[in-house]
């Protein structure tokens, strides 16, 4: 599933190609994604211009010059790429936005769990967005915030930091990696984290996500950046996907087990 670094990589990749260039055509090949796409968008978006590309959690927010905002979620397997108009659409290429310069923003989603919505209201108040926690790369997310929020929480810390109401964008890959680097056992109750541990974890989450963004997201499964190129962060994973292999620090076998229906990999020696 594309997480925060993948979505941010996509935003940065497509923004120069889609902002301040009039939309000339919208093609909706399949309108049944996670929620039905408003077919009227194929009629009322052409002639409009996108003026800003933001991100909130895993949602792309594309501001239209008429006050609307397009809310785009990549779902489990989606990607947005800039392609030439001569490139024929594939089986899972569901949406095309063509711009005056001739190039096309193409949405690819084999599993159709993504979303393409429009709102005339403040997107921050949209039902999909209003409950989200702070962005992890902002000053609002820090060790003191984690410490205060975690008090009396019995939830396993890995599940807790993956809760988008606590902080957005810490998906399974990044939760595994961050907890390993912070030397925190993923099954430890969040409420038992010390203040220093919370500060350490917050700093490491920021560093892991920032590094992944710099390297273009991960290469896992279907993700490619807005330029169609894969990311390279997967080449630097310490624990995720390496259950049973030697720990990169102590060489003891890494433990792998399910937690909240997600694969969890950790070192029982380093993360005790």
Swiss-Prot record:
Cofactor note text: Binds 1 zinc ion per subunit.
Enzyme Commission number(s): 3.2.2.23, 4.2.99.18
Residues binding DNA, per UniProt: 92, 111, 153
Keywords on record: DNA damage, DNA repair, DNA-binding, Glycosidase, Hydrolase, Lyase, Metal-binding, Multifunctional enzyme, Zinc, Zinc-finger
Active site: 2 (schiff-base intermediate with dna), 3 (proton donor), 58 (proton donor), 262 (proton donor)
Catalytic activity, as annotated: Hydrolysis of DNA containing ring-opened 7-methylguanine residues, releasing 2,6-diamino-4-hydroxy-5-(N-methyl)formamidopyrimidine; 2'-deoxyribonucleotide-(2'-deoxyribose 5'-phosphate)-2'-deoxyribonucleotide-DNA = a 3'-end 2'-deoxyribonucleotide-(2,3-dehydro-2,3-deoxyribose 5'-phosphate)-DNA + a 5'-end 5'-phospho-2'-deoxyribonucleoside-DNA + H(+)
ZnF segments: FPG-type: 238-272
HAMAP family named among the record's database cross-references: Fapy_DNA_glycosyl
UniProt-recorded name of the protein: Formamidopyrimidine-DNA glycosylase
